[in-house]
Amino acid sequence: MTFRHCVAVDLGASSGRVMLARYDSKHRTLTLREIHRFVNCLQKTDGFDTWDIDSLEKDIRLGLKKVCNEGILIDSISIDTWGVDYVLLDKQGQRVGLPVSYRDNRTTGIMPQALVQIGKSEIYRRSGIQFLPFNTIYQLHALTKQQPELTAQVAHALLMPDYFSYRLTGEMNWEYTNATTTQLVNINTDDWDDTLLAWTGAKKSWFGRPSHPGNVIGDWICPQGNRIPVVAVASHDTASAVIASPLANKHSAYLSSGTWSLMGFESKKPYTTDEALAANITNEGGAEGRYRVLKNIMGLWLLQRVLKERRITDLPALIAQTEALPACRFLINPNDDRFINPDDMRAEIQAACRETDQPVPVSDAELARCIFDSLALLYADILHELANLRGEKFTQLHIVGGGCQNALLNQLCADACGIRVMAGPVEASTLGNIGIQLMTLDELNNVDDFRQVVSANYDLTTYIPNPDSEIARHVAQFQPKRQTKELCA
């Protein structure tokens, strides 16, 4: 077969898309077309920040039906989403309650309990995963302690992409790359860790053994009656984004830039040394047995909240105003957990500047300048940490995802990090999703083969560092941990 048509459902924390890919195996050309886009936002339910999962499922099905109604024969479907959140099911496979978002405050104070009762080093030795207060391990502990009436009804717990695949196929699956984000998978066995799971109060019977990307979960029957395989890809959106990152060589780092920024490198081995623990480095699962050695950064979430609060719709105009302002007048640590979900992001940023005796950003452009400069400087700090961890410097940084369209931030990143930045592709998560589908269909050999396809079909933009820029001169002075606490607490 010359042409393949694959559908990727890519769900982010603020929006979702159903994308159609067309792959010409003879010429190795790959194109994407957006079929359906929809909003994903939090809602308050019984005092919790929850996801409107029924609305998301409705939009997923609508997008799939749109493809089928065009008369296109779909070869496969797959779903990727954000990590750590889950859906509870009873014995009949019906949902128990609504899925609570990782941004809900129910996990406040939970992680310190685990550090005392299990031990920080022991948790890291077992999982290799960074300490974030909203990891699934702490969410489940909060669930079992705060909502025992729900816990009593639970027979299964599915992570978000696995839940939607279940709704399409009727088959349950626990995909490995996303499972590792829970901080509950043992890094040596690739299975759920008995000690960590027991601490949460959740039953091991809620979970099946994690499966690696590339297996067919089951079939979705389209309105025309065709059975279409649903593939388990690297279902954590960052894992998919890394697959589509055209990394030039082992000296290339990546930055998946979106609501979250995730900076790291690929490795055939995990890094679980005391140094890695001290830096709060994570070793998330990737495709083909590779590890994604990385660190979470709050990312463009801060900007997204400011845009929403200030009702700003013309982002290019705001960026143009921001670029005209001097650099490094207002600096914050984007990874301070005060920015996870404040009532008023603008006020929180201003308070952080005020508390550190800095000028206070007032205009929208000043707020954006504060966010961009602070992110770029934090990127530089973390890239330095990662280079020290592996004992080799990086020569190139690949920025992928929606954030790579921000030319100002890309240049600030290049200047602050002091290395060449390659920006693109924008649709990295979707492309990585498609890549695993094409491998499952035996159209591609492996991840490296797919990256060649990406490089041949998608243009990258190069940013050369300017050592004389204001932000480059400021790098040595910037200490993101100086007066703030990290997400790891």
From Swiss-Prot:
GO terms for biological process: glycerol metabolic process; rhamnose catabolic process. It comes from the Bacteria. GO terms for cellular component: cytosol. InterPro entries: ATPase_NBD, FGGY_C, FGGY_N, Rhamnulokinase. Its EC number is 2.7.1.5. Pathway: Carbohydrate degradation; L-rhamnose degradation; glycerone phosphate from L-rhamnose: step 2/3. It is an enzyme of class 2 (transferase). Substrate binds at residues 83, 236-238, 296. Its cofactor is Mg(2+). Disulfide bonds join 68-222, 353-370, 413-417. ATP binds at residues 13-17, 259, 304, 402. PANTHER family: L-RHAMNULOKINASE (PTHR10196:SF93), SUGAR KINASE (PTHR10196). Involved in the catabolism of L-rhamnose (6-deoxy-L-mannose). Catalyzes the transfer of the gamma-phosphate group from ATP to the 1-hydroxyl group of L-rhamnulose to yield L-rhamnulose 1-phosphate. Belongs to the rhamnulokinase family. This is Rhamnulokinase. It comes from Salmonella dublin (strain CT_02021853).
